Amino acid sequence: MTDFNNAARSWDSNSIHAQRSEAIARNLLERVQIQPEMNALEFGAGTGILSFMLADRFSSITMMDSASEMVAVMQEKVDGSSSKKLKPLLFDLTKETYDVEKFDCILSQMALHHVANTEVIISRFFGILRKEGFLAIADLDAEDGSFHGAGFDGHNGFDVVELEKIMRKAGFRSVQTEICFHMTKMTPEGPKDYPIFLMIATN
């Protein structure tokens, strides 16, 4: 399993992370009309790559992560930038509810498959989303476990049909999914392609 605190300092040096975020941001902007007064939350924001790419589109983005070193890197990047819209936040939404504010948009990329209870976290997303807001989740399509390999205790991607059912059960009305990126990773059997979907749900 990935130790995100140890990975934080070298995270941005892997170009695939930026390439993936660019593809997700592009697909999102093609499918959703974002208004400049909207605020957003990025769940499992890591070092904030996606939020930095989308900062100019929102009034503010709260970058939430439960790994303290990831949040430290985020803060350093914010301090070194001219952006006043990005707000790093150390918080674990899998363990407690967040009642400080509500959001017009919730973003998450490659974080959901690390969360043990998918239904609980989707319900918490719904609870902090404003009416007419949207949830955008980018994650792995269902795979055979080779993406993370032996010892990983999260989800081996998601069957999008089943995930859409969880969304609707939580209260989301419209749910649409597209493949937005492909990652290639080396496995013991050689290079393998892993599709990444972007699911957008509105309440």
Language model: regions and residue ranges:
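Short alpha-helix
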Residues: N156-S174
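A short SAM/SAH-binding and catalytic strip from SAM-dependent methyltransferases
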Residues: D104-N117
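Core SAM-dependent methyltransferase catalytic element
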Residues: M183-N203
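A short glycine-rich, Lys/Arg-flanked "PGG" loop and its adjoining helix->strand segment in the class I
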Residues: E119-K131
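Class I SAM-dependent methyltransferase SAM/SAH-binding core
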Residues: L41-E96
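A short acidic, Gly/Pro-enriched loop at the edge of an enzyme's catalytic core
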Residues: T94-I106
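Conserved class I S-adenosyl-L-methionine
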Residues: M1-Q35, L50, V73, G80, F134-E162
